[in-house]
């Protein structure tokens, strides 16, 4: 198994406020570990940001199939500030799982995510 460290970034997103935009989809035959994520406000006023994990893979817990969950929900980010989520924690993505980003204002949050893909 090969372990490949990568950075996934998007200068501004989402294209439309209220419509989450895909940042990353775990490729086929790959397990991805999210190592960290930073969201930066590039707007002239405070924004709120949401990060979702969209998963339909087999569940190992209460449900037979995983569902969409929030990693961050409507968190305020002040002007010129950034917000680090998952500080010290990891999230595992299976093939087809997605990370989606939303913001209260279109194209006003910049996102950087560090990952490790295991193939």
Predicted features and spans:
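Acidic glycine-/aspartate-rich tracts in secreted/extracellular proteins
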Residues: 42-45, 56-58
């Amino acid at each position: 198994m090969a372990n490949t460290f990568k950075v996934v970034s998007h200068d501004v997103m989402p294209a439309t406020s209220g419509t989450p935009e895909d940042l990353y989809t775990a490729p086929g035959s790959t397990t991805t570990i999210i190592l960290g994520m930073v969201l930066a406000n590039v707007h002239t006023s405070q924004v709120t940001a949401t990060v979702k994990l969209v998963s339909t893979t087999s569940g190992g817990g209460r449900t037979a199939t995983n569902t969409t969950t929030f990693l961050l929900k409507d968190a305020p980010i002040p002007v010129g500030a950034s917000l680090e989520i998952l500080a010290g924690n990891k999230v595992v993505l299976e093939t087809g799982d997605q990370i989606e980003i939303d913001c209260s204002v279109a194209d006003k949050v910049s996102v950087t995510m560090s990952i490790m893909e295991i193939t």
